[in-house]
Each structure stands twice: as C-alpha cells, then as structure tokens.
C-alpha cells in the first residue's frame, strides 16, 4: 500500500500530462517530446515504466503491474506512454498531488454536445498524432471507479466521480468496457493499438480542425484552443455538480427508479452514462470508502426514509449556471441561506397589525377575527388535502409512466410558456420531450407524500409533477422547521395559478393544496399577497371562516365572504388572473349585483377582455377590492340610532334588499350594477368616522326618515362625476332608462334647463385642479346625485344619499388624479354627443363607474335653494315644492341644523354676496326658477342671500347638507345659466387676486428698497479703525485722518434705546442702554460712533442724544491749593483707557498733584501737557504731595501689588476707608450728580455698590458705558454701570 501511495504522490501533472513511464533520461526520443510555443518539455522517467495508461486500477492489480514494468520492451513502453498521455489529456489520469491535498480538479466536465478529446493547454497526445493520437481517445476503463490509492480524500472521490462519466461515455461509444484481466495482460497495449488502427475512429470535428502539427508531426500550440481550455476550466471550477439530494434547501427529487430519466437539471450524456455505469460498477465493490454524506449518493441509492442531509456544502456558494437552461431560481442566492423557524401561512399572520383590517373588522363585526380557530383549521386542512390527493392520485399515477415532468394543463395552454414560474421550466420541458417512459410506482409517490407530511421537501415541480388531477400544486409545508424558500410554479405567478386543472370538472370540489400558504408574507408585500380561491359548497361550510382572515382581503370580501361563499362564489385570487376570474364569474352567475363589483360589471358587458388592458385591470380590481361599498342595505327609516356601528351594519344587507325587491327595475339583474353601489365602501366608512369624530351633525333623522321632504330639498344639487363617467360612452347602459319611472328625475323644466345649461357650460369652464387643494377635491369624489333625486316617494327614494369621498393620503387612487384630469381635458370634445340629450340620459350619466377617481368633475352649477315645480306624476311632492318656494323660513324645516354650534357670521362673505348680487345681472333668457341663483357664489362657497337658506354651518339646506358640512374648504359652484357673468366673475376674482398679490409685492419691494437705501454704506469709510486697542494713543495717532478724530470734548454721547444687530462689518452692534460716542453724522439716518473701543455706524432712530451736561469730558480739577508737589517714578508702562487717565512709560518721573483715593493718584509729567490719574501700584512714590484742604488724606498703607484696584482690608477703620474731601461731599459744578434707578451688586473690587435712589457724584464717564464716581450714602468711590443711574437734575 505504501508503494501505491508513492506511485500516486510521485506523479505530477504538468500542463495536463503525467510525467512518468517513458524511458531513461538518455533516450530522449524527439518524437516523445512536446514542442511548441509556451510548451513544457516532458521527459520519460525510468521509474514506474510499467504503470498502465488508464489511471484507476484496483489495489490487487497494482503489484502485478509493477512487477511487469521491467519486463516490457522499449516500444511498448513508448506505447504505454502514449496511452498515458492520451488518457491524461482527456482527464482520466491518476489524481495529482494537488488533488490529493484537496484542491479542485482542473479537468473539465465536457458537455454532451462537444465530446472533444483534449481541451487541455498543450494538446499533446503523442508524436504519431497522425496515426495514434486519434486512435486512442480515453477508451480503456477499469472496473474500479476510484483511483488506486489509500488516501481516500473526499475531493479526490468527487473529482473522480465527476470525471468518470466522460470516459465511460466514450468507452461505451467506441469500445466495450474491458475487464481488469484484459487491461493487465502483457500484450494488451499492442492488441488495442492494432484494433484501433483498424477502426480509425476519428475524433470530433473540433479536434480535427483545431489540432495543427509541424513538419515532424508534433502538435503545435493553438491559441484558440488554449482560450477554450481556460473557459472550460473556469466553468469547471465554478460549476456545482450536485447530486439530487445534496442540497436540502432546494429539493430536486426523482420520482422514478429509471436512471435514463433526466433529473431536474439537464444532464450531459456523460453524466447519464455515469448513472448507467453505476448500475454495472458500484462504488462499494471496488474500494471501501469512509462514511460520506448523502450528497455523493445517487437518487435511487438513497433511502427515502433516510433523514435529511444537513451538512453544509460550501460548493453551493460557488454555483453558477452555465446556461439559462440550468438556471434554478433560489440556487446560489440569499434565499438558499435563509432559514425560517417554520412555514407561515396567510391564516397564521396576525392581521391585527394591519391598521385597515383592525379598523374595519371592529367597525363591521365589533371584534377582531378569531384567528385561533382559523389556525386550528389550517393544520387539519392541509393533512386532509394531502390524504385526499394521495387517494385520488393512485389510479392516474399508476397509468402514467412519466413522473418527474410537469406538463402544461388546459388552464394554462393559452398563456405563453414564459409565464410559467418553474424553477427548471426549460429542463422540465426537455425532460418531458426526451423521456418517453419511466419506472415510477405508487410506492414511490406514496413515500414522497409521506416525506412531505413528515416535514420533508416538496419537489420544485410541485406535487403537480405527479400528474395528480387535483387542485393547484403546493409548495413544501414543513411544520418541523425546514426551509421553505421556494414557491411552486403555481403560487407566485398568478397567471399560472391553476396549473393542474384547478377549474377542471374533475377537481372543482377540491380546495387548492395550500398553494399560497408557504412564505407569502416573506416574499410579497402584505397588500399584494395572492389570495386563495374560494372553496366550493362541499367544503365551504366548515372552512369559510378561514377566508376573511386572509392578508390581502378587501373590506368587501371580509364582510361578503360569509354570505356569498355559501353559494359557491369564488373569491378573487388576485387582479392579475382576470381571465380565469371572468371564467369563474360566468360559471357562478348567482353573484348578486350588490356584491359584484363595478369593474366586473364593466368587463362582463365588454367580453372578451383584451389582453392589452391587463395592467389596468390589475390596478382597478385591487382598487375595487379596497374601496367597494355596498349601499343597498341602508334603507331610509330602518336606522333608529346614529351610531357608526348601526350605520355600518346596514351596508351588508344587499341580499335582503334583493329578496325584498327594493331595487329598481334596472337593478334587478345579476349583470347590472345599481348606481347606489358606485361609491367606495371605505369612503363611506371614513365619512361616518369623520362625522362621528369631528363634526357635530349627528342628527340623521331628517335624512333617514321616509318623508320625501329632505330628498326634494336637494333639487338644485348636481352630481359629482368621476373622470370615468365623463369618458365612458352612454351606450354601455342601454337598459338603464327602462327602469326609470314615468315621472323622470328632472321632470321639472327648471331643473332640466338648469341641467342643460350646466352641461353646456361644463366644457367651457373645466375644473381647475390648481385652484382647489387636493383635500378639497377628495371630499367630493364619489358623490352621486342618482335617479332618486326627484322621486321622493318612489322606489328610488329608499336608498341613502352618497357621502363625499375623503379618501386622503395613502389612497392609491390619488395618484391617478392628474392623468384623469388630462384624459378629461383631451376628450372634452366628446361630451357634446351626450350634452344634447342630457335631460333624457341624465340617469345613465349617474350610473357610470366610479372606480379610480378621487377627483370629481362637477357640473359647474350652483348649490342653492330655488323653487321647484313638483312632477305631475307624483302628488306627494307638492309639500316639498311649497317648502322649496319658502327657503327654510320655518326652523322645523332644518333637520340638520339641530345640535350644531353657532358659527360666527361671515360678514365678508355677505358683503361679497351683496356686491355680486348688484354687479352680476342675469341674462334675459334665464329660467324663472333660477331667480335666486345670482347670489349663490362667494369665493367658491354656496352662500344664499338670506339666513333662511343656510343651516347653522352656513351650508344650504339639503339632504347633502351634512356631507357638505364635512368639507373643510369651499367648493366652486358657478351658476350654470350665467355664462357671461360667470366668466366675468372668475375674471374679476382673478383680477382681485392679482391686485392683492401686486400690492403685497409692491410693499415688499418698497420695504426692501428702503432697507437697501438705508444700508447703502459702500461709500462710507469710517474715520477710525474698526477695533481700537490700548495702543490707540500710539500707532493710531499716526494715521492720516488724525485731524478728523474729534476729542472727547467734541464727541457727543448718546444712549441706545433698542438692541441693534449689525448686519455688516461696518455696522456697530448696540444693546439697549449702551452709551455710544458719536463721531459724525453720515446722513439723515445713520451716525458713526464708538462703543467699547469699536467704531461703526448705527441707525439714528436707535439712539437718543444725551444732553450737553452729560458730555464725556476731562474732569476739571477742583480748585485745590497744592502746598507741596509730590514725586513718583513709574514702575511699569501704563496705558490709559479713558480720557482722564494718563499714560506713561516705565522710568518716567511723575509729579504728584494729589491723591484721589486710596488707589489712585493724580499727576502730570513735567515738560509735557499730559495730566491725569493713574493707579498707585504702577508708581513708586518718592514724596507725597501736600494739599491745603479742610480734611487731608491720612497716610494710607498702599500695596505694591500690580493690581489696579487694590482694596483696603475690611479690618481698617471706616474713616480710613471712606475719607473724602469736603468738596467731594458737596456737589460742585465740576461734578455731575446722578440718582440710581436700580440696585447694583458689585462683581469686582473696584465697582461701586448701588441701591435704588442713591445719589452718586460722577467724576468720569467711560466710553464703555461705565461711570466712575462716589456714592454719597457710602462715601465710597468706584465704577458702576451708567444705565443704572439717571441725571439728578432731570
């Protein structure tokens, strides 16, 4: 065994050739050397000469070969080398050391279409390529399927397992499989050479065309072949040769033991031959292998009851399909790696998380759906379906030999094959064509179904692959935690929803096998999940409770399913299968008109539905599911309370009203949709909720009573029509006029003329979407003034009035608004056809389909009160006519005004109404019934001329008054008969708006111009620098504008009255109370001044000039008689911050005049005009001055610290701290006395404490707004804020 290991490890594959078994190194036969560009010279090795050409040999035969290797002559050795080269070139050599170490094989797995012999790089077969290289494709095969080595690496096994089919195919085509005795006989090589020379089997055309030789016959390198080799190598490296059960996440079962039947992925012929070879040569017969997972077992070899292989196969992450035919959805994708705890069916989804479902379920049923009951049904339902399918499937599947292919059913034959969502549709197609028979048995199918029930995988073809004549195919439903990321071909694409005769006669009694139950919530959004078909009458009574809890059910289905399902009516499975839907609608013709949606009504009258309109039908059916409302059950007088639940419960009584015969003659047929079912159910519920939540009008007694009075009071109202009603032809409703009463709706000539004028005016005054906000337009989307408008006691008067649409925000139909407007504008010319006969066809116009239009196109007609003549056919309407003549003088005639709060009178509306009533004169040909229409408009609001025409919400008294009271914004109702005056009114309104906007723009522009002019400082150059530092008396005095700088005597102080924020660098920011010193006046609006050492400009209006007595000026010294001057020397440089401070340099001699206080001296520098005060700590006092005053300063201990304001310790006597001269205590002319306005607590040592009312003698006013002075109360000297005091003489 060790020798065999050495044999396997010593062989090296260089460019695809095995280096060995050639002869001694000295016998360098040029015919045995591969030459050419880029080739590698290969020499024959003297060792292991007798190794046979076919690499795999059994362990028992290997010693025999080695013993005979030394006995063979040179020629047979060369022939053996040629055989070995040919075998290695075609991928049948022993594994290389790299392969033994676990690396991937670089030998290609050739396709069945190109059985080329040598795709490797250097294309070397032998020197006799013209004779022998073509005669020796890899034909010799041992009985062993694995290499003769004890190092059984799984990668080696897999590589050999992948390479065997190609050689077996060629061996099967060209020569029978030889036995081991034949291969190991001494004369076997020469015998096969002679036999193959006689047969001269030619290689493929590609090999003949690609192989080129030189004059000696040595094959040259072919660049194209090299590229092909690289391509093949790349594909081989990235190819995943999965066995059928290697990927538990994507099951691909073969339901047959027939190994000729292809599996789900199209196999090459070599792979099929390998499957055949597995019958003859079993792997276990040749070499004992270590325990491997089931990924290396064939499908027939694996036990179906064996547990699933859960080992991670990393090859699937490198899997790439080589062609579109091998593409399998979900493979090598993120879905492969996703693991779910268990399968989720739509019944298990918590519908309470859906806001719309929670709201409407509570609104209609009073409590949420009992989901626990639904979930208990779901488990039993699936098991029952599987058992029934198994039972039904026994006889047909026994007769059907083909078990692994999906054949198209009659339901999908009309669809294009591209719609079939099968993971291997093309492969299935090929297999169904190329597999005439199989060995499928009932036991195999039964085991598959048991595996499914036990938690196993359902095949990708679905259970429909077993040719069962039951309902639609199912996906894997694994309740044990397995993956279920693949949806069968019938569950995702709704075009092939019924893939197995779902509508066929044999399976109408069965429910679909949970086709939409697996992972729908993980793949599709909640609103677009496919819904299940409705079960028929056999299973409906037990399982109908499951259907209302589906994820994507509409509100109509939630409340109608219990009623309609008992009649076997199928619910919608999605808007995209309308052909099947319409077919099932025709099968079940018993669907009532109240539950049949309007789009179905439209499509049934225009069959067959064209395929080009599928996209529109998708949206319309989905929209209808969300918005359809059944209004037939809400009869007048049947509701005693006004609660929302009571009102909503009456929307569900369509079947009762049909049974009572309360519908009109034109609404009795199942194919006709009554006009009162037009508006959206959700819209009505939103109206009820909005009314109950925010509007005070909850008195429905007038509208819900059987008295025709409120019905007749709405005679002037016009209907809000959707865009579809404008675009749809009237000939689609030929039978609607048959059911009309003899006394028509608009029997009154006043109303007829009014309608005629409104219709004629309609095209000239289109609805302007920009002038009305979207919320306003939403309110009047589906209001329909139907035929019961003028027949209060007739059969139409029993139905409720339609409420305004408030479908806002998330409504999908709101996005169709603009296109609907454009379609109406483009087709406005077509309206002239039915405008002429609007009186007769008025009812048919009201019966149009209101599906997708939240935006109405109202007839431009006033909503008002005017006299109306009662129809001659109905005498019960005469009180209503008399009531209409007197516009609501009696408070009892206002049923909707009761309970509403008083609204303040809109005086502006009445002024405008009065102006309109005087300015807009009606034409002479105006009907007499419209005398009061002139004052119907006020900024889009219907405002009658008197209080009697209004309810308490200032809305007209009509049956729609409550609905119009819900509107938060005005409506644009224009008198239909005043064409000219209306245009003038619109133009006048437009002009008024333009004038108002022009005035506002003008005022704004003037203000901006004034601001710009006021801040035009481009020519203003400040006389000083922006910032003034302590060095301003030095360098700043050297600038050219020194003359412009005013002295402290010339600068006038001013105080800021308001805060001023600078907007440019030239402006000086001020706070209220700041004292600024004005340098100059720039213009009549701006000053230039200084504040806190910064120079800038500020507005004149922001400051107030201080009186001349408050000028900041150097303090005139008191007439003090100096007896003896003192003397001091400066220790430091001192820069004065104010005008009274004296600056000096270190070392200068200073003459002391007097001591101001304990911290400051007053002095001058001899020989200069500089005089002022300075801190004591900055100088060394050599001699103190003597001043003749009534009270002299005592000798105070002064500190030599550099602090400018060193304070005496509190332990010193009070007299020593506050010793002042008598002229300080007496206000002199040189000092300004101020009175404190506020109290001030000192923050620093040199600050003065102030109390409200204190008198302070100010000696200095600093330019930063601080004053220096002495308090008369405390006799202390210090600084304090200037805005805390006021002049005493004021």
Curated annotation (Swiss-Prot):
Renumbered residue ranges of the record's region Disordered: 1-211, 238-271, 286-313, 389-416, 463-482, 588-607, 697-739, 783-803, 822-841, 862-972, 1198-1227
SUPFAM superfamilies: SH3-domain (SSF50044)
SMART domains: SH3, Sorb
Domain of life: Eukaryota
Tissues expressing the protein: Expressed in all tissues tested: heart, brain, spleen, lung, liver, muscle, kidney and testis. Expressed in 3T3-L1 adipocytes but not in 3T3-L1 fibroblasts.
Modified residues (Phosphothreonine): 51, 179, 475, 1189
Gene3D superfamilies: SH3 Domains
Residues covered by the SH3 domain: 1049-1108, 1123-1184, 1229-1290
Compartments (UniProt record): Cell junction, Adherens junction; Cell membrane; Cytoplasm, Cytoskeleton; Cell junction, Focal adhesion
Positions of modified residues (Phosphoserine): 55, 58, 62, 185, 204, 209, 254, 261, 270, 345, 376, 407, 432, 969, 1201, 1209
Any one of the GO BP annotations: positive regulation of D-glucose import
Gene Ontology molecular function: any one: signaling receptor complex adaptor activity
Keywords: Cell junction, Cell membrane, Cytoplasm, Cytoskeleton, Glycoprotein, Membrane, Nucleus, Phosphoprotein, Repeat, SH3 domain, Transport
Domain SoHo stretches: 202-247
Record's subunit section: Interacts (via SH3 domain 2) with PXN. Interacts with the long isoform of AFDN and with VCL. AFDN and VCL bind to SORBS1 in a competitive manner and do not form a ternary complex. Interacts with ABL1, CBL, CBLB and INPPL1/SHIP2 through the third SH3 domain. Interaction with ABL1 occurs only after insulin stimulation while this has no effect on the interaction with INPPL1. Interacts with the insulin receptor but dissociates from it following insulin stimulation. Also interacts with SCA7, PTK2/FAK1 and flotillin.
Known role: Plays a role in tyrosine phosphorylation of CBL by linking CBL to the insulin receptor. Required for insulin-stimulated glucose transport. Involved in formation of actin stress fibers and focal adhesions.
Protein name, per record: Sorbin and SH3 domain-containing protein 1
Phylogenetic placement of the source organism: Eukaryota, Metazoa, Chordata, Craniata, Vertebrata
């Amino acid at each position: 065994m060790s020798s065999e290991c050495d044999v396997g490890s010593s062989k090296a594959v260089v460019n695809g050739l095995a280096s060995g078994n050639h002869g001694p190194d000295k016998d360098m036969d040029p015919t045995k050397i591969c030459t050419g560009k880029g080739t590698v010279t290969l020499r024959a090795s003297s060792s292991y000469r007798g190794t046979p050409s076919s690499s795999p040999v059994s362990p028992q035969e290997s010693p025999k070969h080695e013993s005979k290797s030394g006995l063979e002559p040179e020629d047979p050795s060369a022939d053996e080398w040629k055989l070995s080269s040919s075998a290695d070139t075609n991928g049948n050599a022993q594994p290389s050391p790299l392969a033994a170490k676990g690396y991937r094989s670089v030998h290609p797995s050739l396709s069945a279409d190109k059985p080329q012999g040598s795709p490797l790089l250097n294309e070397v077969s032998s020197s006799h390529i013209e004779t022998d290289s073509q005669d020796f494709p890899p034909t010799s095969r041992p009985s062993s399927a694995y290499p003769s080595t004890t190092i059984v690496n799984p990668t080696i096994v897999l590589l050999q397992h992948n390479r065997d089919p190609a050689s077996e195919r060629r061996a099967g085509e060209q020569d029978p499989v030889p036995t081991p005795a034949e291969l190991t006989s001494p004369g076997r090589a020469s015998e096969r050479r002679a036999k193959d020379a006689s047969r001269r089997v030619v290689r493929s055309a590609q090999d003949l065309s690609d192989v080129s030789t030189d004059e000696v016959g040595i094959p040259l390198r072919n660049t194209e072949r090299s590229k092909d080799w690289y391509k093949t190598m790349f594909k081989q490296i990235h190819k995943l040769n999965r066995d059928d059960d290697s990927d538990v996440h994507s099951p691909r079962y073969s339901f047959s033991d027939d190994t000729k039947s292809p599996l789900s992925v199209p196999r090459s012929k070599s792979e099929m031959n390998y499957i055949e070879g597995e019958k003859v040569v079993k792997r276990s017969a040749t070499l004992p292998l270590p325990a491997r997972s089931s990924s290396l077992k064939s499908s027939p070899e694996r036990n179906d009851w064996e547990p699933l292989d859960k080992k991670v196969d990393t090859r699937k992450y490198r899997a790439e399909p080589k062609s579109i035919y091998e593409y399998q959805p979900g493979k090598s994708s993120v879905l492969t790696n996703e693991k779910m705890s268990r399968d989720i069916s739509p019944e298990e989804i918590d519908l309470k998380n859906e806001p719309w479902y929670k709201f409407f379920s509570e609104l209609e049923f009073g409590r949420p759906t009992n989901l626990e009951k639904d979930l208990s049904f779901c488990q039993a339902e699936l098991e029952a379906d599987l058992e029934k399918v198994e039972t039904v499937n026994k006889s047909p599947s026994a007769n059907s030999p083909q078990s692994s292919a999906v054949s198209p059913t009659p339901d999908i034959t009309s669809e294009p094959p591209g719609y079939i969502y099968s993971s291997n549709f093309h492969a299935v197609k090929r297999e169904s064509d190329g597999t005439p028979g199989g060995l499928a048995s009932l036991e195999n199918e039964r085991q598959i179904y048991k595996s499914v029930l036990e938690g196993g995988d359902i095949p990708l073809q679905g259970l429909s692959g077993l040719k069962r004549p039951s309902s639609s195919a199912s996906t894997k439903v694994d309740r044990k935690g397995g993956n279920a990321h693949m949806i069968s071909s019938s569950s995702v694409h709704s075009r092939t929803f019924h893939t197995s005769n779902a509508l066929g006669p044999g399976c109408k009694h069965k429910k679909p096998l949970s086709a939409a139950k697996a992972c729908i919530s993980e793949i599709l959004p909640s609103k677009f999940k496919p819904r299940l078909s409705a079960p028929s009458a056999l299973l409906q009574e037990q399982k109908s409770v499951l259907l209302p809890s589906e994820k994507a059910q509409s509100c109509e289905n939630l409340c109608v399913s219990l009623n309609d399902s008992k009649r076997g009516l199928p619910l919608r499975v999605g808007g995209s299968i309308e052909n099947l839907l319409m077919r099932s609608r025709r099968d079940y013709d018993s669907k009532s008109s109240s539950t049949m949606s309007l789009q179905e009504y439209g499509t049934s009258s225009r069959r067959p539905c064209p395929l080009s309109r599928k996209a529109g039908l998708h949206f319309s059916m989905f929209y209808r599911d969300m918005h359809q409302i059944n209004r037939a059950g809400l009869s007048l007088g049947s509701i005693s309370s006004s609660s929302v639940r009571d009102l909503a419960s009456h929307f569900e009584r369509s079947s009762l009203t049909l049974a009572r015969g309360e519908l009109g003659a034109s609404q009795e047929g199942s194919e006709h949709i009554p006009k009162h079912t037009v508006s959206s159910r959700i819209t009505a519920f939103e109206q009820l909720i909005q009314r109950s939540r925010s509007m005070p009008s909850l008195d429905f007694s007038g509208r819900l009573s059987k008295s025709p009075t409120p019905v007749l009071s709405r005679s002037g109202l016009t209907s809000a029509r959707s865009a579809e009603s404008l675009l749809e032809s009237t000939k689609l409703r030929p039978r609607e006029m048959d059911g009309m009463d003899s006394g028509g709706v608009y029997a009154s000539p006043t109303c007829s003329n009014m309608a005629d004028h409104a219709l004629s005016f309609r095209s000239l005054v289109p609805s302007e979407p920009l002038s009305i906000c979207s919320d306003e337009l939403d309110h009047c989307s589906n209001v329909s003034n139907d035929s019961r408008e003028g027949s209060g006691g007739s059969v139409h008067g029993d139905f409720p009035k339609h409420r305004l649409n408030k479908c806002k925000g998330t409504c999908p139909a709101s996005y169709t608004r603009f296109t609907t407007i454009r379609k109406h504008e483009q087709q406005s010319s077509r309206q002239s056809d039915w405008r002429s006969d609007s009186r007769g066809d008025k009812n048919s116009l009201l019966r149009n389909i209101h599906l997708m239009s939240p935006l109405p196109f109202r007839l431009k007609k006033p909503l008002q009160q005017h006299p109306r003549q009662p129809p001659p056919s109905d005498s019960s309407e005469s009180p209503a006519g008399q009531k209409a003549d007197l516009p609501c003088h009696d408070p009892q005639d206002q049923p909707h005004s009761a309970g509403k709060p008083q609204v303040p009178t809109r005086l502006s509306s009445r002024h405008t109404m009065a102006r309109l009533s005087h300015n807009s004169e009606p034409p002479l040909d105006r009907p007499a019934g419209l005398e009061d229409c002139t004052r119907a408009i006020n900024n889009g609001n219907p405002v009658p001329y008197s209080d009697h025409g209004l309810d308490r919400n200032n809305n007209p008294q009509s049956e729609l008054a409550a609905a119009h009271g819900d509107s938060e914004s005005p409506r644009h109702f224009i008198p239909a008969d005043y064409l000219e005056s209306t245009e003038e009114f619109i133009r006048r309104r437009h002009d008024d708006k333009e004038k108002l906007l022009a005035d506002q723009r003008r005022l704004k522009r003037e203000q901006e111009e004034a601001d710009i002019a006021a801040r035009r400082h481009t020519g203003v150059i400040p006389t000083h620098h922006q910032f003034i530092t302590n060095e301003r008396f030095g360098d700043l005095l050297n600038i050219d504008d020194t003359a412009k700088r005013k002295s402290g005597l010339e600068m006038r102080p001013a105080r800021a009255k308001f805060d001023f924020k600078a907007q440019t660098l030239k402006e000086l920011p001020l706070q209220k109370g700041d004292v600024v010193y004005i340098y100059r006046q720039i213009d009549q609006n701006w000053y230039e001044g200084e504040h806190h050492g910064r120079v800038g400009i500020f507005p004149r209006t922001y400051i107030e000039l201080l009186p001349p007595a408050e000028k900041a000026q150097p303090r005139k010294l008191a007439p003090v008689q100096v007896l003896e001057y003192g003397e001091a020397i400066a220790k430091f440089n001192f820069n004065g911050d104010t005008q009274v401070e004296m600056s000096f340099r270190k070392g200068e001699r200073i003459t002391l005049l007097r001591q101001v206080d304990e911290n400051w001296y007053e002095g001058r520098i001899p020989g200069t005009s500089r005089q002022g005060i300075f801190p004591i700590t900055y100088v060394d006092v050599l001699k103190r001055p003597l001043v003749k005053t009534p009270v002299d300063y005592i000798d105070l201990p002064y500190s030599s610290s550099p602090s400018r304001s060193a304070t005496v310790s509190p332990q010193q006597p009070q007299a020593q701290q506050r010793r002042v001269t008598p002229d300080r205590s007496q206000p002199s002319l040189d000092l300004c006395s101020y009175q404190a306005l506020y109290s001030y607590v000192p923050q620093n040592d040199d600050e003065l404490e102030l109390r409200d009312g204190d008198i302070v003698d100010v000696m200095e006013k600093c330019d930063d707004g601080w004053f220096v002075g002495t308090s008369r109360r405390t006799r202390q000297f210090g600084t304090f804020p200037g805005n805390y005091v006021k002049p005493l003489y004021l």
